[in-house]
Structures are given as structure tokens and as C-alpha cells.
């Protein structure tokens, strides 16, 4: 595979990787129901359907006569090969497809269905039309060229890759070469040690790399559905290493990968375990409080913890950073498109019957929400071009999924359904009611403009639930790339704004734009809240919490 193609796959992976807020899936039953609604519409409105068939016929005539102006969107890189525009046959093939796709979307969009049924119908039609894109066939000009360049070997290699995926990957195209990485060898390599372990988590303390460190430590809490080393990928992408260079005493949680035996672990179980880790960090560093960072579902866990501390009158968290975390679950995106009472209850029932929610199941669901980027992209690369799956650390991490205990999954579903964090005392954790307005610590909330899992508008509303001072920052990236955003990227941008109106769009219109990574802005913010500089410790842990196994520990290797 050429470097250009490999770079393009990596770019799309960075923007569309699914480090998840695990709540629900899309049931096949719901998709079939929406498909039936679409088919019934053709019968119920025959004149409406005939009008669009006639319009498609007129456009098809223009295509055949070479008079059509239809062209793919400028950012649709599937059709970058010059043959799609220069070759008359390929150009007509493409324009016929574009005309058909447009007419189907217009047909359902202009129907008399309800807005929800129109959105669902458009989603189903999009699944069908993207699957039938001309780039997904052996007539793809890039595949034809590759076939002749390799003397047919690309076709044999593609069939071999397909056979492997049918056997080993549930028939889904592999997104990454899983043999290219090993956690602890070329991922998660920052030096440190496990200084505390319980049934739920391991606490890793990283070795300082500066002569002085801030007195107040930082505890990083990753999402439970994926593994912690998203914060410690390659050295140049490692947020943990960046924190160490910024003189932060850095600790990170590594969650255990639960099995059916842990099916009863709920949110309170994770909070109790996290409280033990907080006490260990404070005992090791001698600080009376710490700063905390939570991402995705880890951000929900951190939020529940600080709400619990507020109810107890304990001030163990000085400042909280939330990365792409939705607490106000009023959402209007594809994640919520098929959500209703039946869907939520079915999702809970499914995980309770299995004992756990498999992360691989959630990854498949979300892949079908972005089929071009997360399925057909790799279909073309692996099968039509006969290339090996790309070697990319983010994709390896994304495919190294974990499970969620049924009880915790049920808790997340109930939060999604009833939105309790938006109301005082509507959620109870570890025996205490949660009122986020009583949480007075400073909040740094980061969201991504292109995030299709945790929409930035929802993150903005979520930040306003707290009673402390808020710093909201909007990065020009997707879900995971918002987190993995090291300085020096010439395309990186972020926005800040002191005024915080209730309307997210109003905030965006008046926000200040900045070049480079939000990491720089965050470290400045965090440094002001991290205490005085002191001599860095020369050893990890202490007498009560002795340094044990070297990082990345044991739990990260559990499958």
C-alpha cells in the first residue's frame, strides 16, 4: 500500500475511531422496521413516488448525454481517482449512482412521514446506498489498476484477507494489523509501576522525568469500555508523557476487564474502587487533594465521584478535567436516532442475560453508523486492493476492546433515559444523592467539533451543570483525536470563550480561535491549580503502597 493511501486511512481512523460512551445499540429489528416503513411509503404515496422516478429518469438522460452536472462532494475521497472524472464510462457510472442516491434521499425527505421516521428512513437508505457505492465493487478503477500491476495477485490476496475475516473477525473487514503492536513493548511504554490494586482497578504511578514536580498530583481516569493506554500510545502521542514533561505527578487508572462473574458491578462499585485509588494517591504524594481527569464514560464516573464527595463534605478533588464527556444526555444525533423505551430495555435485557456487554459488539454497532469510514474504507483496502490492514496504534487500541458488567451498563442506560445529573438528588451513588451544583471545584471541559459519539453541544450543556468555575474548550477534531492532540500539529485548532451563554452556538460564534493543540492551554490551566513545585520523588509508591509490577501492569493484558 502506498504511503499516501496509508496516511489517508490513518487520517480517517483518527477522526472516526470509536472510544465509546457505551449506552445502546441499534437492533436489527429497528432497522427492518424502518425499512418496512420506507417500502410502505412507496405504496401509500404513489404519485409522490412516480414524481421522483420521473425526475430520476430525466437526470439519467442527462447523464447518458453527458450533460449532468452531478459530482461527489469535495470531501468525499472515495472518488479521488482521476478515472471517475476523466473516463466517460466511469463518469457516467458515478453520476448514475449519485442521481439514484440523491433521488432516494429526496423521496423520503419530502414524504409525509413524521420527522423521526424520515430520519430513520434516511439512515436506512444511507446504509443501502453506501454499501452499493461503485467504489465497493471490483470495477473500482484503483482495484482494476492494482490487479494489472500485480498480475492478479491483489485479487488472490484480497480473497485471502476476506477468508481470514470471515473466520476471525465476524465477517467485518479488519481495521488494523493486530500483530504489529504489543502493550508494554511499543505501546504503553512510559516508565512506572502499579502502586495499588483491587478487584476493579490497578493504580499506576509514572516515574517523574523532571527534577521538580507540582505538589498536587494528577489522577487520570480512562473510559471503562477501552483500555487506559490511549493516554500512553507512542511517545509523541502520549498525554501521560506530556504531563510528566509538564512537571505533573501523574497517576492513571487501569480498569479490570470484567467477566460474567462481575456482572453485578455497578456505578457505585466503580466509585468505591476509585475512592480507594484516590486515597492511595494522596497517601503516596502527601497532598491533601488532587486534580482529576476523566474521559468519555470515565468522565461520568469522575463526575459521580465528585458529586459523592460533595454530598459527604469532602474536598479531595481540587480541579476536574472532562474530555468528550456527556452528562446531559439530551442528544440529537445518530446515537439517539433509534432510542426509545423498548430499545433501552432490550439493551439492558441483552447485557443482563449475557452478564456483560462486549466492547466488540458496541464497536460493530458504531461502525455501521459511519460505514464509509469504518467499514467500506477497509473493504476496499483489504479486499479490492489486496493490501494488508494498516498498522496504526489508535486502531489497535480501538480494537483492543473490553467488556462492561451488566449492572454498570444498566446504570448507564438509566442515566441516558432519565438524565438524572441535570436534576439535584435524582441520582444516588454509594448511598448519597448527587447534586452537581454543590460541586464547587474548577472544571475544564473539552469537546470536539467533529465528534459523532459525544456531540460538542451536549458536552457544552454538561459543563454548565456544575457549581464551580468552568473553562469550556472546543477542539477541531473528532472523538479520539480531540484527546490525542499533541502540540506541533499545523492543522490543530481550538476555541475558548469567557462568556458562557446557554446556547452552545452563541458561545461558538463569539469564541476566540487559537492555533495549535489544546494540550498547551490545558497545561497552563492545570499548572495554576497544581500547587508549588517541589523536588521530584526518587522512588515510586511508599511504605504503605509499595511499587509492584512495572507498568502497564496486569489488568491491561486481560482479554
Curated annotation (Swiss-Prot):
Q: Which GO terms describe its molecular function?
A: acyltransferase activity
Quick one: a GO biological-process term for this protein? Answer: poly-hydroxybutyrate biosynthetic process
Query: Which pathway?
Result: Biopolymer metabolism; poly-(R)-3-hydroxybutanoate biosynthesis
Active-site residues from the entry: 296
Q: InterPro entries from the xrefs?
A: AB_hydrolase_fold, PHA/PHB_synthase, PHA_synth_II, PhaC_N
Tell me the Gene3D superfamilies matching this sequence.
Answer: alpha/beta hydrolase
Give one Pfam family, short name only.
PhaC_N
Its EC number(s)? 2.3.1.-
Which keywords annotate this record?
Answer: Acyltransferase, PHA biosynthesis, PHB biosynthesis, Transferase
Family affiliation: Belongs to the PHA/PHB synthase family. Type II PhaC subfamily.
Another remark in the UniProt entry says: P.oleovorans accumulates poly(3-hydroxyalkanoates) after growth on medium chain length hydrocarbons. Large amounts of this polyester are synthesized when cells are grown under nitrogen-limiting conditions. When nitrogen is resupplied in the medium, the accumulated PHA is degraded.
- Chain's role: Synthesizes poly(3-hydroxyalkanoates) (PHA), complements a mutant of P.putida that does not make PHA.
The protein depicted here goes by the name Poly(3-hydroxyalkanoate) polymerase 1
> What species was this sequence derived from?
Ectopseudomonas oleovorans
What's the gene? Answer: phaC1
Amino acid at each position: 500500500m502506498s504511503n499516501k493511501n496509508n496516511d489517508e486511512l490513518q487520517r480517517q481512523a483518527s477522526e472516526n475511531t470509536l472510544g465509546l460512551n457505551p449506552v445502546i445499540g441499534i437492533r436489527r429489528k429497528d432497522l427492518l422496521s424502518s425499512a418496512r416503513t420506507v417500502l410502505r411509503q412507496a405504496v401509500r404515496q404513489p404519485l409522490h413516488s412516480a414524481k421522483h422516478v420521473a425526475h430520476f429518469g430525466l437526470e439519467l438522460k442527462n447523464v447518458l448525454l453527458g450533460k449532468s452536472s452531478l459530482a461527489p462532494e469535495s470531501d468525499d475521497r472515495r472518488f479521488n481517482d482521476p478515472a471517475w472524472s476523466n473516463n466517460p464510462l466511469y463518469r457516467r457510472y458515478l453520476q448514475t449512482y449519485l442521481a439514484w442516491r440523491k433521488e432516494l434521499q429526496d423521496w423520503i425527505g419530502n414524504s409525509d412521514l413524521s420527522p423521526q421516521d424520515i430520519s430513520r428512513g434516511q439512515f436506512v437508505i444511507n446504509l443501502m446506498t453506501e454499501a452499493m457505492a461503485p467504489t465497493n465493487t471490483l470495477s473500482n478503477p484503483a482495484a482494476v489498476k492494482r490487479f494489472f500491476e500485480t498480475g492478479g495477485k491483489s485479487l488472490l490476496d484480497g480473497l485471502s484477507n476476506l477468508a481470514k475475516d470471515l473466520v476471525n473477525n465476524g465477517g467485518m473487514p479488519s481495521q488494523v494489523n493486530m500483530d504489529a503492536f504489543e502493550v508494554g513493548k511499543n505501546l504503553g511504554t512510559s516508565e512506572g509501576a502499579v502502586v495499588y490494586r483491587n478487584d476493579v482497578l490497578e493504580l499506576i504511578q509514572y516515574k517523574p522525568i523532571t527534577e521538580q514536580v507540582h505538589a498536587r498530583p494528577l489522577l487520570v481516569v480512562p473510559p471503562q469500555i477501552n483500555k487506559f493506554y490511549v493516554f500512553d500510545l507512542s511517545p509523541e502521542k502520549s498525554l501521560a508523557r506530556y504531563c510528566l514533561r509538564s512537571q505533573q505527578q501523574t497517576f492513571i487508572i487501569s480498569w479490570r476487564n470484567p467477566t460474567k462473574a462481575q456482572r453485578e458491578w455497578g456505578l457505585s462499585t466503580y466509585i468505591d474502587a476509585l475512592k480507594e485509588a484516590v486515597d492511595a494517591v494522596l497517601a503516596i504524594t502527601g497532598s491533601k487533594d488532587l486534580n482529576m481527569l476523566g474521559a468519555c464514560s470515565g468522565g461520568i464516573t469522575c463526575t459521580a465521584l465528585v458529586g459523592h464527595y460533595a454530598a459527604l463534605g469532602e474536598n479531595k478533588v481540587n480541579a476536574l478535567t472532562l474530555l468528550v464527556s456527556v452528562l446531559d444526555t439530551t442528544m440529537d444525533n445518530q446515537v439517539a436516532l433509534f432510542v426509545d423505551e423498548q430499545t433501552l430495555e432490550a439493551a439492558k435485557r441483552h447485557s443482563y442475560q449475557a452478564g456483560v456487554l462486549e466492547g466488540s459488539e458496541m464497536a460493530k454497532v458504531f461502525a455501521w453508523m459511519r460505514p464509509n469510514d469504518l467499514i467500506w474504507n477497509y473493504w476496499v483496502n483489504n479486499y479490492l486492493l489486496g493490501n494488508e490492514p494498516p498498522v496504526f496504534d489508535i486502531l489497535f487500541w480501538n480494537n483492543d476492546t473490553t467488556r462492561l458488567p451488566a449492572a454498570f451498563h444498566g446504570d448507564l442506560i438509566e442515566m441516558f433515559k432519565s438524565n438524572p445529573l441535570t436534576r439535584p438528588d435524582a441520582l444516588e451513588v454509594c448511598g448519597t444523592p448527587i447534586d452537581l451544583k454543590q460541586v464547587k471545584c474548577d472544571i475544564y471541559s473539552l469537546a470536539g467539533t467533529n465528534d459523532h459519539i459525544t456531540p460538542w453541544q451536549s458536552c457544552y450543556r454538561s459543563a454548565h451543570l456544575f457549581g464551580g468555575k468552568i473553562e469550556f474548550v472546543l477542539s477541531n477534531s473528532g472523538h479520539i483525536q480531540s484527546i490525542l492532540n499533541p502540540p506541533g500539529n499545523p492543522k490543530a485548532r481550538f476555541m475558548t470563550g469567557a462568556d458562557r451563554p446557554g446556547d452552545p452556538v452563541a458561545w461558538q460564534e463569539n469564541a476566540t480561535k487559537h492555533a495549535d493543540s489544546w494540550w498547551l492551554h490545558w497545561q497552563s490551566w492545570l499548572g495554576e491549580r497544581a500547587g508549588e513545585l517541589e523536588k521530584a520523588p526518587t522512588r515510586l509508591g511508599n511504605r504503605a503502597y509499595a511499587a509492584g509490577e512495572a507498568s502497564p501492569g496486569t489488568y491491561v493484558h486481560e482479554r
